[in-house]
Amino acid sequence: MLHTIGILIWIIIKILVIVVPLLISVAYLTYAERKVIGYIQVRIGPNRVGLKGLLQPFADLLKLITKEIIVPTRSNKYLFVIAPLFALVPSLVGWAVIPFQEGIVLANINAGVLYLFAMSSLGVYGVLIAGWASNSKYAMFGALRSTAQTVSYEIAMGFALVGVLLAAGSMNLTDIVNSQKGGMLHWWFIPLLPLFLVFWISGIAETNRAPFDLAEGESEIVAGFHVEYSGIGFALFFLSEYASMILISTVLAILFMGGWLSPFEGITFLDQIFFIVPGFVWLLLKISFFLFVYLWVRATFPRYRYDQLMRLGWKVLIPVTIVWLIVTALMVVAHVKPWF
């Protein structure tokens, strides 16, 4: 009995060690976004609350928590209230299989890639439930757009994952990282470059970020699926979006960019200088790079039209992944060096 309780407490501690820093990261990602976009637009960004505006995320959180939760009169009240949780939970449970370094992972399962793919697909249910339960045409339009978008880009993302499985020969994320040992030239983003780019673009679309944020199109459907939400409900949708951004960036770093591996591995004099840097620091740097590109893309590109979004998914990304899967299979059979 005591042994079981001890195991349970240890699991809870491991979950908190992952979730608490993640929530703090989400808070400061919103701050980073406002700062980066501010500098791109030749503005300063938030700089009033705390030193250089560093406490702004907590001020925003306090504001949202203290706001009234308004439930529309003709909405389905129970589904309306729990929909934000349906959106948030998949973006958190995906972290269970993410290895931060060799041996540092909550659940080192052999079907890690499949688990991540399944969890990333579940987030759309929260959006769909929110749109339907709100009993608002704007919310419903946003939810339907998001569902169609997710279905379209999940296919391309799935094919891109198959390419990694072909190359690494495993669905275990730790094994996939270890298959990229030998330095930057051995990372999968080089032989699988088209699949890497497709996965990256699909990840932006999956998280409903600009220029694929049609589900929230302010200029067309007010605020999309969360138009009726305020206070903590709105905050949870906000949280799920940014947590998903961090998760997609982490998956990109693990599958294509060597995860926690040093980029200087195999380069003797640089390897000797940077060998003291822990693996998880390299992983955090790679995640930060992908997150910065998320913000840069949002500030740079205009929103796609709905037909352009669908055309890109079905007529460009899916054919590209199918063709490159065939090329990858041929490279694996031919044992193309230094990757296979």
Curated annotation (Swiss-Prot):
Enzyme kind, highest EC tier: translocase
A GO BP annotation: aerobic respiration
One MF annotation (Gene Ontology) recorded for this entry: quinone binding
InterPro entries on file: NADH_UbQ_OxRdtase_su1/FPO, NADH_UbQ_OxRdtase_su1_CS
PROSITE patterns assigned to the protein according to its UniProt record, in alphabetical order: COMPLEX1_ND1_2
Gene Ontology, cellular component aspect: plasma membrane
Annotated compartments: Cell inner membrane
Disulfide pattern: none
Pfam family, one: NADHdh
Topology term for the membrane: Multi-pass membrane protein
NCBIfam families documented for this protein: PRK06076.1-2 (NF004741)
Assembly with partners or alone: NDH-1 is composed of 14 different subunits. Subunits NuoA, H, J, K, L, M, N constitute the membrane sector of the complex.
Family: Belongs to the complex I subunit 1 family.
Protein name: NADH-quinone oxidoreductase subunit H
Species per Swiss-Prot/TrEMBL record: Legionella pneumophila subsp. pneumophila (strain Philadelphia 1 / ATCC 33152 / DSM 7513)
